[in-house]
Amino acid sequence: MSQFFRKGGIALNDTEWIQDFADRRLQYGVSQTKLAVMAGISREHLSRIESGKVAVTEEMKVKLLEALEKFNPEAPLTMLFDYVRIRFPTLDIGHIIKDILQLNIQYMIHEDFGHYSYTEHYYIGDIFVYTSPDEEKGVLLELKGKGCRQFESYLLAQERSWYDFLMDALVDGGVMKRLDLAINDHTGMLDIPELTEKCRNEECVSVFRSFKSYASGELVKHEEQDKAGMGYTLYIGSLKSEVYFCVYEKSYEQYIKLGIPIEEAPIKNRFEIRLKNERAYYAVRDLLTYYDAERTAFSIINRYVRFVDKEADKKRSDWKLSVRWAWFIGENREPLKLTTKPEPYTLDRTLRWIQRQVDPTLKMLETITAKTGVDYLKEIRKSTKLTEKHYKIIEQQTTSTEDVILEK
């Protein structure tokens, strides 16, 4: 694998290899810090390698190439953490924020209410930490989709990976309550209406006894984060069980939310593995044992479901895998890698709300002012006062990621 980069079929010498490697890294749009975290080395060491200040061994070439290929934008499948919920058996919320999340609590907003019967919480963006005086409840960390992406920006600045964080959480006694693994299909290898039809035709061999499907635009009767734009959706398994799958058209969601034409969407479909309690714990244990996201994800999928083609002259247990499904689970395709998509906390949702709900009224008032000279906005601003929460958000938005994180 260390001779992966070639010119005219000739293996490169070290200088050429380093240049070709650095060019490929830039082509993939990967920073040195991000790649170093994935490879398990320091950014400074990677910088010295790319500048030719230290020799690069064959072993290091393999390690760097494996790390870099995890960011290959042409990979047909990628996987992300899309939901993480962990309960810690402690009432010391400061310890969890400081030592496990490694964030500075002074930049987090405190609210005297919570969810899941917790009584208060701290949050920054979509990263929520709940607490309660009830020792049995302890402290609860919740990262939904956006929270995972935002937390990845902090992990990157901390030079930590998801594996590092999960290990820290479990060592500290963390109890997995939920884990969602999202497999993104970038090429359309999954056909959700076809999978739904196979479920109806008994071409879905599964230990699950139920499935539900919804057409594009149909109300998804479940507590989904993005239920308004999920497109064709198929649930395999009971939503009340500790493991079930949700497969939906991500391209439709991107069209509804961002206006991206369906045919141009970078992600066509998404296959989500949703795990709770003991199932979530065993998945994390497997991830931390093998550091192989594909192994963990597809061992779960293959344990619970497979799609086949009906063969009239054979028993159902002997029907062959559907070609499209076989490709999805690993036959003749590039390996799936655990990737990250760090996104800083922004005011995008607030700005979109202002644009839809507030700005038309502001524009109306400005027009009236221009025609009559009566400045309603100026009068309103005189009595407007910012709350402590507003000042905290200002602080969050004007502070660098490096200042929000804590070094262990």
Predicted features along the sequence, with ranges:
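Short alpha-helical DNA-recognition segment
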Residues: 29-48
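Short, basic-rich loop-to-helix N-cap that marks the start of a DNA-contacting helix
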Residues: 53-66
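Residues within the helices of the helix-turn-helix
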Residues: 22, 33, 47, 62, ...
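Short alpha-helical segments used as structural interaction elements across diverse proteins
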Residues: 21-22, 40, 45, 58
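Structured, helix-rich domain cores that form ligand/interaction pockets
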Residues: 2-16, 23, 27, 66-345, ...
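Alpha-solenoid HEAT/Armadillo repeat architecture
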Residues: 26, 51-54
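Residues in the recognition helix of alpha-helical DNA-binding motifs
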Residues: 24, 38, 49, 350, ...
